[in-house]
């Protein structure tokens, strides 16, 4: 009987710990680009860093806030309906994919120079930035 009570108590404590952990994970504050310190980089140098050594580039850029300068090579939307800007690089088969938080009010054009800020998600044939915002159009 005492053994059964100990097992039930342990199960309740484990469930309580899991519940507290889940609550903490789902309620932690969202990181904001406005509060983050930006690392300025061009689309070409960002892609070159990842192509030369992905491990070193991840240590430098992964999950950090970047301000990326480049020329728009493509404007599209993803499966979720979010606007996506692809920045041109010297490699015709790769670029910097920037998923925007909101649709820009201004009419962006292919070939236009822009500066985009966002969090780097890594490299999968393209460098991927998430939660992007347009800083300035040139």
Where are these regions (language model features)?
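OB-fold and OB-like single-stranded nucleic-acid-recognition modules
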Residues: 2-138
């Amino acid at each position: 009987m005492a053994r059964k009570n100990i097992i039930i108590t342990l199960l309740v404590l484990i469930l309580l710990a899991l519940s507290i952990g889940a609550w903490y994970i789902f309620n932690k504050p969202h990181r904001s680009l406005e509060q983050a310190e930006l690392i300025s980089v061009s689309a070409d140098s960002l892609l070159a860093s990842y192509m030369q050594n992905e491990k070193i580039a991840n240590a430098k850029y992964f999950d950090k806030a970047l301000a990326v300068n480049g020329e728009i090579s493509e404007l599209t939307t993803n499966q979720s309906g979010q606007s996506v800007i692809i920045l041109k690089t010297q490699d015709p088969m790769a670029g910097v994919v920037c998923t925007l938080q909101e649709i820009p009010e201004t009419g962006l054009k292919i070939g236009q120079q822009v500066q985009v800020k966002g969090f780097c998600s890594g490299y999968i044939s393209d460098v991927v930035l998430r939660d992007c915002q347009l800083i300035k159009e040139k």
